[in-house]
Amino acid sequence: MNRRKFLSYIGCGCSSLMINGCSTAPITDRRQLKIIPESNLNAKAAIIYEKVKEKEKMSDDKKMLNEIKDIGKRMENSISKYFSETGKDDPTTNFDWEYILIENKKIKNAWCMPGGKIAIYTGILDITKNNNGLASVMGHEIAHAVAKHSVERASRGML
């Protein structure tokens, strides 16, 4: 096979991948590369989330966990309402929302895995100070999941 023919095959393959693997990000309508099916990533995230729950010490602060769940539920409802009112497909319809509070004062962080699996470390509570601050952090993390950043990042990693 000559070089020109080989390069044309590579070009066609890459073009096909880009056309079939591109989609639009919710809210911003930015083009995203999505080669990996979201359902696969959500399933893997759920398994990892369960392992985190087994490995990490969960906080005994039921009041704070309930506040986290309440904030999360209000965000879930707001997300659904936004997509309903704008006529766009809700990217969270297949999410199985879950919230945990991990007892670790040294880690000042929170995260949201694909599929709506959210973890808050007790260390960040000193920074957020109140429910409004906590809602800001949670909203930021949930926005990554809504925007499908993990799917996009994993897809780019396959190239």
Model-found features: residue ranges?
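A Zn2+-metalloprotease active-site environment signal
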Residues: N2-L159
